[in-house]
């Protein structure tokens, strides 16, 4: 199964592709986002595929199992916690992620939800504030898009 997400924001745009062979396989995430300042930026699946009020209407991180925010490698993490992407000096982020928690199949599918890229680096739940365990202190939402089915 394949999905696509077109990221739009103020000066930020990109295309993210998702591929999963079956419901037991990892999801391969690939793409490019342009327009982000150099450095790391939080990158998450959010609960709603709603962009009527920009990225704010995308809701919180997708978290159907009610866990704390964490790193993509943590057992205790939101399903939507994909960590950080890194933008180079040319304001381009090349994305190549393999994730074993998100899925394109079944009740907890990410299809119809959204991807949000944030202003700051995600602290992966290791910060000293309560927000660290909820949002990773990743800051404002710079760009987002709805994850939709695509041709294989």
UniProtKB/Swiss-Prot annotation:
Zn(2+) binds at residues 61, 69, 78, 81. Coiled coil: none annotated. It comes from the Eukaryota. Binds 1 copper ion per subunit. Belongs to the Cu-Zn superoxide dismutase family. Cu cation binds at residues 44, 46, 61, 118. Keywords: Antioxidant, Copper, Disulfide bond, Metal-binding, Oxidoreductase, Zinc. Signal peptide: none annotated. GO terms for cellular component: cytosol; mitochondrial intermembrane space; mitochondrion. PANTHER family: SUPEROXIDE DISMUTASE CU-ZN -RELATED. This is Superoxide dismutase [Cu-Zn] 5. Destroys radicals which are normally produced within the cells and which are toxic to biological systems. Its EC number is 1.15.1.1. The lineage of its organism: Eukaryota, Amoebozoa, Evosea, Eumycetozoa, Dictyostelia. One of its GO terms (biological process) is removal of superoxide radicals.
């Amino acid at each position: 199964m394949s999905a696509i997400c077109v990221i739009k924001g103020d000066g930020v745009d990109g295309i993210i592709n998702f591929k999963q062979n079956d419901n037991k396989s990892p999801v391969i995430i690939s793409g490019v986002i342009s327009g982000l300042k150099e450095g790391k930026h939080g990158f998450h699946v959010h609960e709603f595929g709603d962009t009527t009020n920009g990225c704010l209407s995308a809701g919180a991180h997708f978290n159907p199992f009610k866990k704390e925010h964490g790193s993509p490698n943590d057992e205790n993490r939101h399903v939507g916690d994909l960590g950080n992407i890194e933008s180079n000096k040319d304001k381009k982020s090349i994305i190549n992620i393999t994730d074993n928690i998100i899925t394109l199949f079944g009740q907890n599918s990410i299809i119809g939800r959204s991807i949000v890229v944030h202003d700051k680096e995600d602290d992966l739940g290791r910060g000293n504030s309560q927000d660290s365990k909820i949002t990773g202190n990743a800051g404002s939402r710079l760009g987002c898009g709805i994850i939709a089915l695509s041709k294989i």
